[in-house]
Structures are given as structure tokens and as C-alpha cells.
């Protein structure tokens, strides 16, 4: 069963990050987020590159951005996009919709 990996609160995001060896949880207040981007990308599906979308969250806490792709988050991806767009607007976080 799939589970959510991005949770939005009024002023905070909770990100579940799945690594190679472990799963970690990152709490981010709105002032720690530099930008939220929706971008087009290519994703490998069954040995072929396919057009896809991704969410990129850049923060002050981490050197690397947090990336969530459409095919890995298939069940919740559209909900993530709606919630993050609303979160960015309400908390004055820089938001780019590059789709």
C-alpha cells in the first residue's frame, strides 16, 4: 500500500525521504524553504525514457533539493501539487510552475 511522503500544515512541511538504506523524516518551517518548483523531466520506465513531472523543494537545511517524481508518487502526486501551490501562496514561499 502506498503512503504519503509530503504532509502540509499551515506553516510547516513534513517530508518523508526514502534513501538507499534508510527512511528519514524532515520537518521544514516555511522560512526554511527557499523555493518550490514543478518541472518537466524524463524518467526511466521499463528501460525507456518517458516524459514526466517532478516536484523540487529547495531548502536552507540541505545542500541538495528534495525531489519527488510523478511515477514514484503516482497515487498522491496531484494532491501534492495542489497542497504545495496553496502552501507557497499562503506563506510567501517562492513558487515556480514550469510545466
Give residue ranges: language-model regions.
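Conserved beta-hairpin
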Residues: 1-27
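Acidic, Ser/Thr- and proline-rich intrinsically disordered linker/docking segments
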Residues: 34-99
